């Protein structure tokens, strides 16, 4: 299952058949192959890819040995992609073609501590008719004797965002190899400049 590491550049639109298509621009690769996992040695097939060059002074000794063994320059990011055994020593954006479908994984924007209305779309309490200081409250979180407790997983206020999110089955609209750019239809998780992993989709289009 082929894949590549990239950085979300931002969103724009392109025109296709006189219609505007919203696309996310991803700067993908080139990613050097740092390590290969094999069923004989590791019990599974995978490839470890690197992305974004790193200052050698900021690399610790174990990683320096890891990069030297692979014969690659130090990189800032290392990620494994399972069931992928690419040819050659570098993975580029050319592994994808327009019209293919991909899954994009990233870290959603962190929004800090959020209440139930923002975090879970609760309606909140009434604004008037005697309502006092409950306008944005969740309401009851558990009855008296039954159940007499708060269920695990109850939707309440708390930390919102900054989670690993995968958006599936996005269409590759265009590939620009000379600039290492990948254009996918729709939105992908995370802020501009955030790390994303683009993989061949697990879900075929219906």
UniProtKB/Swiss-Prot annotation:
Transmembrane segments: none annotated. Gene3D superfamilies: 3.30.160.810, Translation factors. Keywords: Ribonucleoprotein, Ribosomal protein, RNA-binding, rRNA-binding. One of its GO terms (biological process) is translation. PROSITE patterns: RIBOSOMAL_L3 (PS00474). Pfam families: Ribosomal_L3. SUPFAM superfamilies: Translation proteins (SSF50447). One of its GO terms (cellular component) is cytosolic large ribosomal subunit. One of its GO terms (molecular function) is structural constituent of ribosome. Part of the 50S ribosomal subunit. Forms a cluster with proteins L14 and L19. One of the primary rRNA binding proteins, it binds directly near the 3'-end of the 23S rRNA, where it nucleates assembly of the 50S subunit. Belongs to the universal ribosomal protein uL3 family. This is Large ribosomal subunit protein uL3. It comes from Thermus thermophilus (strain ATCC BAA-163 / DSM 7039 / HB27).
